[in-house]
Amino acid sequence: MSSHPRLRVDPGRPFIHPAFDYLLIGGGLSLLVIGWLTFGRAPAVRQWLQTNLWTLVLLSNSAHFAGSTVRLYTKPGSFRDLPFLTMGLPLASVAVLTLAIAWPGGLGRHLQSLYLTWSPYHYAAQAYGLAVMYCYRSGSPWTEDDKRWLRIASFLPFLHVFLAVGGAGIEWVMPAAVLRQPAAEAVRSGAVAGLRVLSFLTPAVIFLLHQREGRSRLPLISLLILLSNSVWLVGLGYTTPLTIAVVTVFHGLQYLAILTIFHVKERVRAPAGPRPWWIQALGFYAACLALGYVLFQVWPYAYVLLGFGFAESVLLVIAAINVHHFVVDAFIWRLRRDSNYAVVSAQPAVG
C-alpha cells in the first residue's frame, strides 16, 4: 500500500451552479473568449466586440461600479454601521472631484494616477476575496500561513502592473530621474519579468501542494479565479485601451454576479413576504444599470454646463467614481459578524 495521501481535487461548493460559478465568478468565460479571439481567428467576432465594446462596458462595468453603491444603501444596517461611508464619503468625493476638475494639471493629475494605480490592486483584492469565499464554503480548515500565501499569490499581478505600466504605479510615486538610472531600469525590468512568471506559477504551486498534502484546502474554482486575474492583469498586458476595456467587462460581470447573489439571498430570506428571487435579481441589476448610466453618461455633462472642459470632466469623473467604488467595496464585503457570512456558508441555489 502506498503511503502517499489520495489525490482529492475539491471543485468548490458553488453559490448557484458549477457552470454559472466557473464561467462568471471564476472567470472561465473570459478565458474562453480571450482564447477564441487570440487563437481562433474569428475576425467577425473581434469586429463585433470592437463595435459594441462600449455598450458592453455600460451593461457590465458601469453597472458594477454603481452596484457597490446600490449594495451599500440597500444593505440592512448600513446607515447605522457606516455613517461616514453612506453620508460623508459622497460629499467628500464630490468636493475632491470638483477641485480636481478646476485644477486638472495638479490635483486632477494625481487623482487620475491614484485611480490607475489603485485599479489593479482592487482587481487583486477582489480575486483574493472570492478565492477565500470558496475556501470557506469548502469547509476545510485554513491557517494564517495558508491565508498569507494565498494573499501573496493574489497580489503578485498587482505588483507586476505597479512596476510595468507607465504613467501610474511606480512612475507616479518615484521621480522620473531615479527610474531612468541604468541600475533602476535593470532592477525594474528584472522584477517585471520575474513577477510575470510568479503571477501564474505561485497559485498553481499552492494548489498542487495542497493536493499533495491530501487536504485540498484550495478549491479548483479558487485557483481559476487567481489565474483569470493573472491573465487579465499580466497576460493581456493591461496597457492598451482595448485590452483594458475587455478586461473591465469580465471583471464587471464577475463582480455583478457575486454582488447580485449576496443581495438576492438576503432579500429572499426577508421575513415580510419576499418576492421571487428573479424579480429581486432583475430589480437590483436595473438599479445598478440606471445609476451607472447617470454616473458615467450624465454626470460629466453637469461639469461641462458649469464651464469646465469636456475631456477633463469625463476623465476625472471616471477616476472619482473608481476611487469611491474602491473605498466602498473595502467595507461592504466584511464576513465576520455580518450578514455576508450567512450567504457564504449557505447551500447552493438562489431560491
Regions flagged by a language model, labelled:
Residues S2-V57, A330-F331:
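N-terminal signal-anchor module of multipass membrane proteins
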Residues F65-P76, A127-M133, A204-G214, H325, ...:
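C-terminal ends of transmembrane helices
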Residues G237-T243, Q297-L316:
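Extracellular/periplasmic helix-loop-helix junctions in multi-pass membrane proteins
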Residues G77, L99-S189:
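Membrane-interface helix-loop-helix junctions at boundaries between adjacent transmembrane segments
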Residues Y128-V132, V249-E266:
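Predominantly late transmembrane helices and immediately cytosolic-facing juxtamembrane segments
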Residues L23-G40, M87-I101, S154-G166, A193-H210, ...:
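Hydrophobic core of alpha-helical transmembrane segments in multi-pass integral membrane proteins
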Residues S2-R6, N52-T74, Y123-Q126:
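Central hydrophobic cores of alpha-helical transmembrane segments in multi-pass inner-membrane proteins
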Residues Y73-F84, C135-D146, L208-L218, R269-R275:
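Membrane-interface helix-boundary motifs at transmembrane edges
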